[in-house]
């Protein structure tokens, strides 16, 4: 009975840590000049002991990380996906390209001269699959909204 409780606790902790990734984002300076561009970034923070498959994991079974950005009335360039790190895991014969720690996905937003309004709102959806060295969890989507003042 005691080992069953231990197994349950380990399972719960694994599920909690698999959902421990945070996604944030910002536009440099918090504003964009009307008729101009500004740089921004989506940031994925991955807790220790976990990794997520990169945008190009080099494995047909690994689900790649994706970032989708959208915003009404603006043009978005990017994001740019950084290179991951090749790692060898017990569950795979070949190396898999992964992200660990803090990963930045830079982008550029351009606000046209005729933009109506004083605030830009960007929607970002990050899809990733978190894994330990032994097992991968189901993929998740995290959505955030980034706002910036239009000057």
What annotation goes with each model-predicted range?
Residues 1-5:
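Positively charged n-region of N-terminal signal peptides that target proteins for export
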Residues 18-151:
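Extracellular/lumen-exposed scaffold segments
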Residues 6-16:
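Bacterial N-terminal signal peptides
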């Amino acid at each position: 009975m005691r080992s069953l409780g231990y197994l349950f606790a380990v399972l719960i902790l694994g599920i909690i840590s698999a959902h421990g990734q945070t996604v944030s984002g910002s536009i440099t300076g918090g504003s964009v000049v009307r008729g101009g561009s500004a740089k921004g970034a989506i940031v994925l923070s991955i807790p220790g002991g976990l990794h997520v498959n990169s945008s190009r994991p080099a494995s047909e079974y690994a689900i790649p990380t994706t970032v989708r950005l959208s915003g009404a009335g603006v043009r978005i360039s990017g994001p740019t996906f950084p290179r991951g790190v090749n790692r060898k895991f017990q569950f795979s014969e070949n190396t898999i390209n992964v992200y660990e720690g803090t990963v930045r996905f830079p982008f550029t937003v351009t606000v046209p001269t005729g933009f109506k309004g004083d605030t830009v709102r960007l929607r970002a959806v990050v899809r990733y699959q978190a894994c330990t060295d032994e097992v991968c969890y189901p993929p998740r989507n995290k959505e955030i909204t980034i706002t910036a003042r239009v000057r």
